[in-house]
Amino acid sequence: MSVKYLEKYLNFEVIVTLTEGGYIRGILKGYDQHMNIVIEDGELINEREKIKIGSLVLRGAAIVSISEGEKF
């Protein structure tokens, strides 16, 4: 996945698959050349629950994939 790929998702809801398992759903607000991303209105989603976490920065190394947002 290249950094240019993320440009089309700026200010839209995305689903981020994490290397440790689970997902983050939120609005993509920014990114850098290392694939670190800024999410607003974030929600951690795993097999058992959904946890609202607000704004956060995710390191590129913790990300498996980023896709268009969808309902869980």
Residue ranges and their predicted role:
Residues M1-F72:
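Conserved RNA-binding domains used in RNP assembly and mRNA/RNA metabolism
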